[in-house]
């Protein structure tokens, strides 16, 4: 599942429809621009709590992704704890994968 998640995120990155990093994800959630959030499996407790609370308050689904190092490497970045998805169709695909 994690390979499929990172492949979809890679597509979104190339299309310019993802936000990388906790600060960007929090800002995107506050502005109502995100359709889904992928949180690294090893995200810190504080990060997990902040992002989860904000996503739940905004009605945005959360998807558990691979660890931060893997998530970042697959996106061509240093370790990444959170990725926000702006594209609704991409978000549906990610949430469907999470339900499998």
Language-model-derived ranges and their functions:
Residues 1-39:
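N-terminal first-folded block
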Residues 30-53, 59-61:
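N-terminal positively charged helical leader segments and presequences
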Residues 68-100:
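C-terminal structural segments of small proteins and small subunits
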Residues 16, 33-36, 58, 77-81:
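A generic structural signal for short beta-strands and their flanking turns/coil linkers
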Residues 51-79:
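Mid-chain, well-packed structural core segment of small domains
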Residues 7, 23, 27, 49-53, ...:
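Solvent-exposed alpha-helical segments within well-ordered globular domains of core cellular machineries
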């Amino acid at each position: 599942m994690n390979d499929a998640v990172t492949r979809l995120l890679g597509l979104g990155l190339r299309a310019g429809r993802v936000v990388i990093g906790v600060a960007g994800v929090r800002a995107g959630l506050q502005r109502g621009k995100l359709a889904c959030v992928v949180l690294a499996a090893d995200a810190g407790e504080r990060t997990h709590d902040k992002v989860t609370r904000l996503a739940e308050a905004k009605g945005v689904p959360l998807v558990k992704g691979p660890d931060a190092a893997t998530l970042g490497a697959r996106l061509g970045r240093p370790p990444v704890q959170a990725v926000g998805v702006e594209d609704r169709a991409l978000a549906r695909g990610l949430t469907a994968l999470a339900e499998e």
